């Protein structure tokens, strides 16, 4: 008798869909802080025209946004410590307390 893997029956699991949507939402919010909204809209339209409203399209958009943000941060975004010499100190903007014990 030949062994075969179990058939993948039924629709894809819901939690995966929800996770993809949540990741995409978070990336979009971060991308809007760093890139022109018109550029992001054009990118979204391009992906939608190519893939429609599918998980495949969402995955491609996630990959592109992750790469764009990574490159943006590595080139020295002023909103990030990534790419700056020494990484910068995020606490340096907090003035020292005058009433130290």
Curated annotation (Swiss-Prot):
Family annotation (Pfam families): VPR
Location in the cell: Virion; Host nucleus
Classification via InterPro entries: RetroV_VpR/X
GO BP: symbiont entry into host cell; viral penetration into host nucleus
Residue span of region Disordered: 81-101
Skewed-composition ranges (Polar residues): 90-101
Principal location class: virion
In-chain residues carrying the UniProt-annotated modification Phosphoserine: 80
UniProt KW keywords: Activator, AIDS, Cell cycle, Host nucleus, Host-virus interaction, Phosphoprotein, Transcription, Transcription regulation, Viral penetration into host nucleus, Virion, Virus entry into host cell
Gene Ontology CC: one annotated term: virion component
Entry superkingdom: Viruses
Role of this protein: Stimulates gene expression driven by the HIV-2 LTR. Prevents infected cells from undergoing mitosis and proliferating, by inducing arrest or delay in the G2 phase of the cell cycle. Cell cycle arrest creates a favorable environment for maximizing viral expression and production.
Something else known: This is a macaque isolate.
Description of how the protein assembles with itself and partners: Interacts with human UNG.
Record's protein name: Protein Vpr
């Amino acid at each position: 008798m030949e062994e075969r893997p179990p058939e993948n029956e039924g629709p894809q699991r819901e939690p995966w869909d929800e996770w993809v949507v949540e990741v995409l939402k978070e990336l979009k919010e971060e991308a809007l802080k760093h890139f022109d909204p018109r550029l992001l809209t054009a990118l979204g339209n391009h992906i939608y025209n190519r893939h429609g409203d599918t998980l495949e399209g969402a995955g491609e958009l996630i990959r592109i946004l992750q790469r764009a943000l990574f490159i943006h941060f590595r080139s020295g975004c002023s909103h990030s410590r990534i790419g700056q010499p020494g990484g910068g100190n995020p606490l340096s903007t907090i003035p020292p307390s005058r009433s130290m014990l």
